[in-house]
Amino acid sequence: MVSRFGGRGVSRRAVWSTVGRKLALPLLSFGLFASLAAPSRGYGESKEQPTTAPPPTIQAGTDSKAGSHALLGAVDEITRKVVAIRGLPMKSTFARGVLTRQEITLRLKERIHNDYSPEEVRGEALMLKRMGLLPVDADYEKLLFELLSEQVAGFYDPYRKTLYVADWLPLDMQRPALAHEIQHALQDQHFDLKKLARPLKSEGDRQLAQAAVVEGDGTAVMMEFAARGMGVESAQLPTVLARLGRQMMQLAMSTTPSLQQAPAVLRESLMFPYAAGLEFVAAVRADKPWSRIDAVFRDPPVSTEQVLHPDKYLSGERPWKVTTASLTSLPQYKELRRDVLGELMYKVWFSRAQSERDAEQAAAGWGGDLLVGFAQEGETLPLLVALSGWDTEKDAVEAEQAAQKLVQNLTGKSSDKLPPPGKSPLFERHSGDRSFAVARRGQKLLIVCGVPSVSTSTVVAEIFRSWNAVPIGQVAP
């Protein structure tokens, strides 16, 4: 094994390919925090969880479970190494335990049911289905639990102050997995993970951005821990890690069929805190000490845009503010849910109708947005209104074209010819008696889904008249 990058006979790419393949599976499995915060889009306020419940009793076991028990005995040793890497001293001890897959699934359900009511979960599912991001007949909660219970192989619970190791994790992955979770315990002692993990009502994009800090920091520490164990020097780690997140996720996808088959909205939400978070932490840290990331915990990014483009975090660029009003033209519709999609989810949404690269480019000019769902009694799917602001009019035109392709896709009319860029005051397609439409006014872009066809023009005019989207500008972090 080489002792530094670029050593004779072994390239930097080969070294990190080895590390990446070794860690690809557990990289997606850490942190109950992000696994729950990311897929759920931020509806509802969190209720404090009990902190007095004892950790599960550790039973004697065999095979991988026995290995998990043995690993728990190495917590103190691994903690010392993590503290040396990251520089956050341990303020107090934390409990530790081993959970079966069934026990972890129960913990996942407990956490989600505590944070979200059945009505909130149902409302979120209906909006995702109207957006075309979930099959209409999908059981959203079942999909969520199946994916999470398969991926979560260990976690630190900030409510119980307890670190858990899964009994099925292969032994060669357990030490870096434990290093990641120990870092979460240290984060909790210094920055209060309960505060960062608490669902943010109507701010799912901001919640994902905060999750990226927590998981990006944990993943970067894990990578450095693994690199040192392989004899690799860490001086150039920030530079390498700043480009490694996407490669790591591609490796994880290739070894995890369930992720490949999962709806893109769940897959991207689950992966984002680790992949983009790793690259964000590495880019912000650059050649600075780890204390630079301590400052990020105290003033975390407020949007996935800031995570995807660290320069926008460093310059303090803030999302646009979107204000709304009731739909007087459709008084029978009542508000169901609202949320900020953010650059990441616009990319996911646009990618339904075009390549991921083109969707990423179209979403890159995102400035701010708000998605509001309206429901009428007796209807299966809600009416959606998505108003967004874009950095420049050119960016808005590019997003408008992506939205037109999306509307064609949602209505089964992808073969229709698109109008010239920026030349359609109202782009509308129909599915039965429902309209899906796109309209732009300067840097503001409107997408409506599921509007009664006879009301489309009236609804669009009302939204541009009574709703608004304005840039906030820059606020130094």
Locate each region found by the language model.
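Catalytic zinc-binding patch centered on the HExxH motif and its immediate surroundings
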Residues: 106-119, 139-160
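Bacterial N-terminal signal peptides
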Residues: 24-37
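Short pre-active-site segment immediately N-terminal to the catalytic Zn-binding motif
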Residues: 163-178, 209
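Pan-zinc metallopeptidase signature
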Residues: 250-382, 387
